[in-house]
């Protein structure tokens, strides 16, 4: 189970020390760095990039990848009758960086254990894409992007997790696709809900009864 890392520790120096075969003591100052992945028996959570680098002024895509263990699941932005959605907040990035919201692939309809309750969830690996654009006048050689990720992973019980994740990318003049991550980003985009359509929802309320309908100019499915 992952809990918030005390950010005050960012300012502390660690020490790696050893004594060599001649009895001489050696010490190295060590500063803490955040990893890009967190895991336990129920889930693996990772911050990844679609590209191997970043170009000032151009939009790249990061992704928060969640891979629950068998029989476990995470939640959509509206979890349903139980559960809480994944989030990525408290970003640290160069001043002027534009960071978009998490995008949400379409979830599964998940009944809750012999009850009338229903959840909207992901029972397998899911990637939440995030658009990131650093300022066009950025002059550094590398960029570190860090976020506080929160998730809720459930089987018959739910385990909340929270971990600061970080990724560092070199600055370049042209973007280069990370072939190892290309498929998971492509799959995530295929599963995103279609936003450009003319479907209208119609809701009617009569007492305790609610009716929901949809209207479109042509057959949709």
Placement of each model-derived feature along the sequence:
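Extracellular/lumen-exposed scaffold segments
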Residues: 1-221
């Amino acid at each position: 189970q992952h809990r918030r890392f005390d950010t005050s520790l960012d300012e502390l120096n660690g020490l790696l020390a050893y004594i060599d075969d001649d009895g001489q003591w050696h010490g190295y100052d060590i500063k803490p760095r955040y990893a890009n992945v967190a895991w336990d028996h129920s889930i693996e959570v990772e911050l990844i990039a679609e590209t191997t680098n970043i170009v000032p002024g151009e939009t790249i895509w990061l992704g928060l990848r969640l891979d629950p263990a068998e029989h476990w699941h995470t939640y959509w932005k509206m979890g349903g009758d139980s559960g809480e959605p994944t989030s990525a907040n408290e970003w640290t990035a160069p001043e002027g960086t534009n960071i978009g919201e998490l995008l949400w692939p379409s979830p599964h309809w998940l009944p809750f254990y012999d009850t009338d309750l229903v959840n909207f969830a992901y029972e397998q690996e899911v990637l939440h894409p995030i658009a990131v654009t650093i300022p066009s006048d950025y002059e550094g050689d590398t960029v570190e992007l860090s976020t506080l990720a929160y998730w809720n992973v459930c089987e018959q019980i739910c385990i909340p997790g929270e971990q600061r994740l970080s990724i560092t990318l070199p600055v370049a003049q042209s973007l280069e696709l990370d072939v190892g991550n290309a498929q998971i980003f492509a799959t995530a985009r295929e599963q995103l809900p279609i936003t450009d359509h003319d479907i209208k929802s119609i809701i009617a309320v009569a007492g305790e009864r609610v009716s929901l309908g949809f209207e479109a100019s042509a057959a949709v499915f």
